[in-house]
Regions:
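Short glycine- and Lys/Arg-enriched binding-loop motifs that mark or flank ligand-binding interfaces
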Residues: 6, 89, 118, 126, ...
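Short glycine/serine/threonine-biased micro-segments
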Residues: 8, 34, 91, 139, ...
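Glycine-rich loop-to-alpha-helix module at the N-terminal edge of alpha/beta enzyme cores
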Residues: 32-120
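Conserved small-residue-rich beta-alpha loop and adjacent elements
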Residues: 123-169
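Short connector loops/turns at beta-strand edges and beta->alpha or beta->beta junctions
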Residues: 26-28, 40, 161-163
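Hydrophobic face of amphipathic alpha-helices that form TPR/SEL1-like repeat modules
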Residues: 1-28
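Residue-level signature of catalytic and energy-coupling elements of molecular machines
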Residues: 10, 29, 66, 110, ...
Length: 169
């Protein structure tokens, strides 16, 4: 596998040469790639990019359009299931069948939230005589996600899929 860096604003952003993490297959101990170690500069750049997206194209998408994008992500995962499974096996050290199930679960989360994106809206709740309460769902804004090493595919689907479906960046 090629070494990986950060993807910020749709572009590869390299880490400093001394800010690299060697990734090892936990079942063999074999190093198979290096990834960039993000620091404050990369975090600040990613947050600024996400804020700009909220004020730009992403923030202007309808819930339906966001949902379609999540469904596209699910399709990409399914179309590349063998590659994603092999990566998950090496990265996490799980057996092939379990890693494949995790990729499928990630795709299913993106499908679920993609299909739910335009179904969750405001509610009108009866209150007192002659009064109602209106609730309105709004995105929180920029969200950060901590992904554990042992279930990365499932947690990415579960947390990132939900956040994006609701309009967060």
């Amino acid at each position: 596998m090629d070494n990986a860096d950060h993807i910020i604003e749709g572009r590869l952003v390299p880490s400093a040469p001394d800010a690299r993490i060697v990734v090892r297959d936990p079942s063999t101990g074999e190093a198979f790639t290096e990834i960039g170690r993000g620091g404050q500069a990369e975090i600040d750049q990613a947050v600024a990019s996400a804020r700009a997206a909220l004020g730009g194209e992403w923030g202007g998408l309808s819930a339906y359009e966001r949902g379609r994008r999540l469904l596209s992500m699910a399709k990409l995962l399914r179309d590349n299931i063998d590659t994603m499974t092999a990566l998950e096996v090496r990265d996490v050290g799980k057996p092939v069948a379990q890693s494949r199930a995790d990729v499928v679960a990630c795709a299913r989360y993106f499908e679920f939230y993609g299909e739910a994106a335009d179904k969750l809206g405001s509610e009108t709740i009866p209150f007192q005589n002659g009064y109602t309460v209106l609730t309105k769902r709004e995105p929180h804004g920029v969200t950060g996600h901590i992904i554990p090493w042992n279930y990365p595919m499932q947690i990415i689907g579960r947390s990132v899929g939900a956040a994006l479906a609701m309009g967060n960046a």
